[in-house]
A protein has these predicted regions:
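Bacterial N-terminal signal peptides
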Residues: 7-15
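Positively charged n-region of N-terminal signal peptides that target proteins for export
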Residues: 1-4
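Lipid interaction determinants
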Residues: 18-76, 84-134
């Protein structure tokens, strides 16, 4: 019985990082989901909300802040890269990168891979619609 429990535990330990990594969207999935679309976002760390549009070529995102310190302001950020694994990097005074998870309920959560939110789940996106609806 101990051997069965040990083997089961080992399988779970080894498989966990693999399944976790597979939860992130790849480049193709991110482009199909977000490029040429407008959606709502919430910063999970400070609570601010915004509406964002990413152009159809996935080169620029425009953010209109609804609440928080930047409420009422609009910023344009250049997307500087998107890896095949789905890591997207953009500029905002500094370069920030993230990976995105499809939560399966119409929402998406971003995990920082660089910058001040590295390794933190910091953004939730929802209500995706076609075109620029800012």
């Amino acid at each position: 019985m101990r051997r069965i429990l040990f083997n089961t535990a080992m399988v779970l330990i080894v498989a966990s990082p693999i399944s976790y990594a597979e939860e992130f969207m790849n480049k193709e999935q991110r482009q199909a989901t977000f490029c040429g679309k407008t959606f709502y976002g919430k910063n999970l760390i400070n609570g601010s909300t915004f509406k964002i549009h990413i152009d159809s070529e996935c080169k620029t995102n425009t953010i209109h802040f609804l609440t928080g310190k930047k409420a009422g302001k609009t910023e344009e950020r250049k997307i500087i890269s998107m890896s095949d694994e789905g890591e997207l990097c953009h500029t905002s005074n500094r370069d920030y990168c993230n990976k995105m998870k499809n939560m399966g309920d119409g929402t998406y959560k971003g995990i920082g891979t660089s910058g001040r939110w590295k390794d933190k789940e910091y953004v939730k996106l929802s209500n995706i619609v076609d075109g620029n609806q800012l």
